[in-house]
Curated annotation (Swiss-Prot):
Pfam families: DLH. It is an enzyme of class 3 (hydrolase). It comes from Saccharolobus solfataricus (strain ATCC 35092 / DSM 1617 / JCM 11322 / P2) (Sulfolobus solfataricus). One of its GO terms (molecular function) is carboxymethylenebutenolidase activity. It catalyses: 2-(5-oxo-2,5-dihydrofuran-2-ylidene)acetate + H2O = 4-oxohex-2-enedioate + H(+). InterPro entries: AB_hydrolase_fold, Dienelactn_hydro, Dienelactone_hydrolase-like. The keyword Hydrolase applies. This is Putative carboxymethylenebutenolidase. Keywords: Hydrolase. Belongs to the dienelactone hydrolase family. Its EC number is 3.1.1.45. Signal peptide: none annotated. The active site is at residues 148, 195, 226.
Length: 257
């Protein structure tokens, strides 16, 4: 079964895609990439349902869906990513981009670039309410799973609620890193070998995992790039994606026992 549902969160009705078999073994909260709740995330949710799991994929852009659609986001982020890494801390670089954007583009940039932390704080609140919604459905165990931006949000969510497991696809570390001590269940981390901005955080992550004695399965795919699991994207890596999916299935079987 699959359907669109809405759940309450801080005065808003958050839209979400639900895919589930009868009598699911556990539930997975699927957190989208920077592109929002799109066909790729829905397909991943269906794949999880086919494995016997409930999958709930919230549209964490519901509050700003009038401007945060995939086309607008691509238009802005391609400009942002065109800035050389060494100039991304220079306010003048962003000012040049902002001056070339229309009003919707400027709103996207404000939400996802200039005020990203504030936006993600609200998304975490809405993800917590997704956890509460899933909990109300009678499922005994709940896992978070996220990609890119959503990987970081899935990781952060694990520091906020007692998840039974966390699956991070090339997402940033929780903030602050010490929050890892709050994580309850095991973690599966799947990373691209050619992803310097994310991979730079892995040594600190591993140190924190050791310090707080957490359960982490870490896999780095040499030669793969950020977003290697997205079969609609230019960075799709079939070999890495297939191996990662097998690891996801194995991890979920372990957690569901």
């Amino acid at each position: 079964m699959e359907k669109e549902i809405f759940y309450d969160s801080d005065g808003a009705k958050i839209r979400a895609f639900l895919a589930t078999p009868e009598n699911p073994k556990l539930a997975v909260i699927v957190i989208h990439e920077i592109w929002g709740l799109n066909d790729n995330i829905k397909d991943i949710s269906r794949r999880l349902a086919n494995e016997g799991y409930m999958a709930l994929a919230p549209q964490l852009y519901t509050r700003n869906e009038d401007v945060l659609n995939e086309g607008n986001i691509q238009n802005v982020m391609m400009k942002v990513w065109s800035i050389p890494p060494e100039k991304r801390n220079d306010p003048n670089s962003y000012q040049q981009i902002m001056s070339a954007l229309d009003e919707k583009g400027k709103k996207v940039a404000e939400l996802l670039v200039l005020n990203r932390q504030k936006t993600e704080e609200q998304m975490i609140k809405d993800a917590i309410k997704a956890y509460e919604y899933v909990s109300s459905q009678g499922v005994k165990k709940i896992v978070s799973m996220g990609f890119c931006m959503g990987g970081g949000l899935a990781f952060q969510l694990a520091t906020e609620v007692p998840l039974d497991g966390t699956i991070v696809f090339y997402g940033r570390n929780p903030q602050p890193l010490e929050a890892i001590q709050k994580i309850k269940g095991p973690i599966l981390g799947l990373y691209a070998g050619e992803d310097p901005p994310i991979d730079a955080g892995l040594p600190d992550l591993i140190s924190a995992i050791i310090k707080y004695k957490k359960d982490l399965e870490l896999k780095i795919y040499p030669g793969a790039y950020h977003a290697f699991f997205n079969d609609r994207g230019r960075s799709y890596n079939k070999e890495a994606a297939e191996d990662a999916w097998e690891r996801v299935k194995s991890f979920l079987r372990r957690v569901s026992k």
